[in-house]
């Protein structure tokens, strides 16, 4: 049997999508650990994205067709800890220039490539790009969908060295280091686009 599309025919409800845009109230945080011979003397750092954008296209009847893109401005990442303000400025400057090289790499991106729904959880295979290097990362995303807002939370860990980044070293002879593994916590709040 041959099916011929009819111009102007209504599209199947299963293909109808709802588009959500990330709100500034969303929270994107990076947590670092410490390593090295004198790692005990170092600090774990909490880094917050102050500028980001993102879009979620959700297909309620076919969640596996849904997709998401998130972009984080690297020059708007800000170190929140340790509590010493002078130290925060110093660590933020080192992160932007020595670690992320924001002059050459202005964004970090996360883009879904496959989605599988299980209850209120989505298993997402995503492409994560940092410093022009891309790796696939598996995500488990908890999703709550209200009438006008989607909320999604996930946590994932990547190794800086996978993206050509040498973890920051400081202290006497580089004996205090940031650990290679960094953890991203995302709490996305996304209003429905009209």
Predicted feature locations:
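Low-complexity, acidic/polar, glycine-enriched regions of mature
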Residues: 9-194
């Amino acid at each position: 049997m041959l099916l011929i599309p009819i111009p102007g025919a209504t599209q199947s409800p299963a293909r109808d999508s709802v588009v959500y845009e990330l709100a500034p109230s969303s929270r994107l945080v990076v947590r670092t650990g410490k390593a090295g011979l004198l790692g005990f003397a170092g600090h774990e750092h909490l880094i917050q994205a102050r500028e980001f954008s993102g879009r979620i296209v959700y297909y309620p009847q076919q969640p596996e067709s849904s997709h998401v893109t998130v972009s984080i401005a690297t020059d708007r990442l800000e170190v929140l800890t340790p509590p010493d303000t002078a130290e925060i400025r110093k660590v933020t400057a080192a992160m932007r220039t020595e670690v992320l090289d924001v002059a050459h790499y202005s964004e970090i991106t996360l883009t879904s490539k496959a989605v599988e729904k299980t209850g209120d959880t989505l298993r997402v295979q995503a492409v994560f790009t940092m410093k022009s290097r891309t790796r696939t990362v598996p995500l488990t995303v908890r999703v709550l969908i209200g009438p006008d807002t989607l909320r999604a939370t996930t946590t994932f860990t990547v190794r800086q060295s996978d993206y050509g980044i040498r973890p920051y070293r400081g202290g006497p002879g580089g004996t205090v280091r940031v650990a290679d593994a960094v953890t991203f916590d995302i709490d996305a709040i996304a209003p429905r686009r009209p």
